[in-house]
Amino acid sequence: MKRFAVVTLFPDAIDCWLQASVVGRARGRAFDVLYVNPRDFAKDRYRSVDDYMFGGGPGMLMRYDVLKPALDHAKILVQNPLVLALSAGGKVLNQEMCTILSSYEGDIVLLCGHYEGMDDRIFDHVDLEVSVGDYVLSGGELGAAVIMETVIRLLPGFVEKSDNVRKESFTNNLLEEPQFTRPREYEGKEVPEVLLSGHHQRIELWKKEQRIKRTLVQRPDLLTSAKLEPMDLQILRRVLTDMEKVKRAIFGEQSN
């Protein structure tokens, strides 16, 4: 069972997510979460965890003399920990990283900053800085929740039908195909006939073509590292040819 030790000022923010999320059902079976609050390691009667920056600057930084003992304690609670810090300058989280983290044999420590950030000295004790995207959050708790969910979903014991995970978007660096449920028709919008045909080979071919087409249109950057089989490449060429024909029909032969 993989354990996550989260260093955070706001453990309730993550615990509320766990209680509401589907991954919470696997707690105690596929994973567990422990919390370490840096405020418990504050040295003054006010339990201060932040202070003004040396050299000036807006906002407050979390103190190194509070973060370091909190991180040390978190590492004691788990086995062979990999320490990740949520950081805007970190390596951007993707499905490949999630797969690597899920297969890591030890446990994971997540260090969440708050306020204007953390005293930079704490990063000397971190194995990897991770960002969940190019935007600003007020703290690392949401990012930690994202990392945990993406990793937990890949752990043995989380999804009974592991095929569900393997077929999700990004698993092979391709987006999922369009998906439909009842009713078959509503307000003139119909489910593609092929999905109702009962012809499993045609259905699988349609799904594969739609995955490639959707990825090409919405996230072409993923195709550079996608694991494409010879048939996938044939489909990709056909889709590109069809798109070029449409482009010429709309813009003319000289379109670029």
From Swiss-Prot:
It catalyses: guanosine(37) in tRNA + S-adenosyl-L-methionine = N(1)-methylguanosine(37) in tRNA + S-adenosyl-L-homocysteine + H(+). The keyword tRNA processing applies. Keywords: Cytoplasm, Methyltransferase, S-adenosyl-L-methionine, Transferase, tRNA processing. GO terms for molecular function: tRNA (guanine(37)-N1)-methyltransferase activity. S-adenosyl-L-methionine binds at G113, V132, G133, D134, Y135, V136, L137. One of its GO terms (cellular component) is cytosol. SUPFAM superfamilies: alpha/beta knot. Homodimer. Specifically methylates guanosine-37 in various tRNAs. This is tRNA (guanine-N(1)-)-methyltransferase. It comes from Coprothermobacter proteolyticus (strain ATCC 35245 / DSM 5265 / OCM 4 / BT). The lineage of its organism: Bacteria, Pseudomonadati, Coprothermobacterota, Coprothermobacteria, Coprothermobacterales. The gene is trmD.
